[in-house]
């Protein structure tokens, strides 16, 4: 995407952030951390209706190491982290005007064979929970097995990390 279009895209996303009860009070630095790499890598979807943005979704392809880094601090990802592996994470999901289901259907159709996870945060909460998403053509049982494998790998890596820390 051309640089001028990147600025236009950033404007659309900033407008959605300003209209989102969850995002509107977040800092400009969080907007930059969460949105600029997605735009630069083309790892986003923007839905428009009558020339007006109605929903936005961005994702990162993380390595296990960067997944752990992200889970420990959601604002820790740097540009190179966004394409460091094959573990897909939704970074932003914004539909402030009631188009959440439209975005959901669009993503299932656009990524029919992909698996994603996200950290879901509710307005007024400082904690999030991991949610899972699979494309429209992925067998649900297979998706569950793969997600279980992801969790197993994540837990083992966290255990190994804590053992290394406690030894030192």
Curated annotation (Swiss-Prot):
It catalyses: a fatty acyl-[ACP] + L-lysyl-[protein] = N(6)-(fatty acyl)-L-lysyl-[protein] + holo-[ACP] + H(+). Its EC number is 2.3.1.-. Keywords: Acyltransferase, Cytoplasm, Transferase. Its main location: cytoplasm. The active site is at 23, 92. It comes from the Bacteria. It is an enzyme of class 2 (transferase). One of its GO terms (biological process) is toxin metabolic process. Induction: Levels of toxin expression vary greatly among strains. Highly leukotoxic strains (JP2-type strains) produce more LtxA protein and ltx mRNA than minimally leukotoxic strains (652-type strains). Variations are probably due to different types of promoters. This is Leukotoxin-activating lysine-acyltransferase LtxC. It comes from Aggregatibacter actinomycetemcomitans.
């Amino acid at each position: 995407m051309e640089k001028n279009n990147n600025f236009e895209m950033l404007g659309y996303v900033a407008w959605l952030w300003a209209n989102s009860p969850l995002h509107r009070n977040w800092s400009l630095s969080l907007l930059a951390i969460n949105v600029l790499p997605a735009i630069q890598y083309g790892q986003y979807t923007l839905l428009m209706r009558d020339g007006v943005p109605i929903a936005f979704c961005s994702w990162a392809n993380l390595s296990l190491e960067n997944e752990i880094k992200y889970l420990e601090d959601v604002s820790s990802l740097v540009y190179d982290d966004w394409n460091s592996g094959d573990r897909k994470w939704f970074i932003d999901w914004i539909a402030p005007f009631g188009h959440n289901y439209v975005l959901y259907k669009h993503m299932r159709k656009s990524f029919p064979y992909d698996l994603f996870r996200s950290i879901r945060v509710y307005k007024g909460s400082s904690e999030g929970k991991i949610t899972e998403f699979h494309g429209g053509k992925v067998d649900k049982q297979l998706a569950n097995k793969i997600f279980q494998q992801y969790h197993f790998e994540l837990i083992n890596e966290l255990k190994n990390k804590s053992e290394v820390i406690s030894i030192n």
